[in-house]
Amino acid sequence: MTFISLRLPEMRSQGVFCVVLLLSLSSCASVPLHQGTSLGSYADMTASGGSLTKAKLRVDPAPVLAAQTVRIVRTSAQIGNSGAFDPKNLALVTNAIDRALCTGLSDRFQVVASNQPADLVVHATVTDIVPTNRTAAATSAVASLGTSVALAVPIPRIPIGLGGLSVEAEAVGLDGTQKAAMLWSRGANMLTTKARISTVGDAYSLSSAFGADFSRMLVKGQDPFKGTSMIPSAQKIKASLGGGPKYDACKAFGSAPGITGAVAGQLGLPPGWSDKGAATTQ
């Protein structure tokens, strides 16, 4: 009798975990690739991506790997429903992309200021944001706080109103021609994307994933979705925790929220509660 009473909670937790895993595999927002008008060329791009990400890309390895310096032009937005988002919240998303790009590119390139010449000039454009349903996000956040502690397993979000992000970006050389380009989209996942009570909550959370994928393509000079994963560098870990960036040019995008941001994310708070945004304007 004692044996049964000890094992039931464990079996219940294992059962819940299995259900969560099965749900997470099929329950994520579907965000199609949105081709905008910001790239110099959309030719010769090949389909790529991972289990959660859709992508089309092209990269010219020789000039990309030969490049030593890079300049980041602030991310812009060309979305049809821009009026549905507070400009301050939209700015947090675009700046989070810039911050992630700057941190990722710092692994191999010297990132220079906006008024300096560079071997590569990088510019990204948000082409679509699927808004997060704030009511559903709030319900998920409250439910997660209570049940995850009791069951000691991750609790999935409510599969309603999941948001998403679509971005396009390119790297242009000194001769003005495109050396690399990417179309990218990803939707929030029930299990891996924490609910934030904001219409841009999921887009903000996914922005760092785009920045990591695009910067990895330039650092490696190849498809970032192929090959082995890269171990985060010391400078990248430091920056993610809110520390100073490797290059002064990255200070323009402000510091990452770090541990405070992680706690805010667990509580479902909007991005603006912990992210102060860009440090300067350009």
Features from the language model and the residues they span:
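Sec-exported extracytoplasmic/periplasmic mature domains
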Residues: D98, C102-Q110, P131, S215-D223
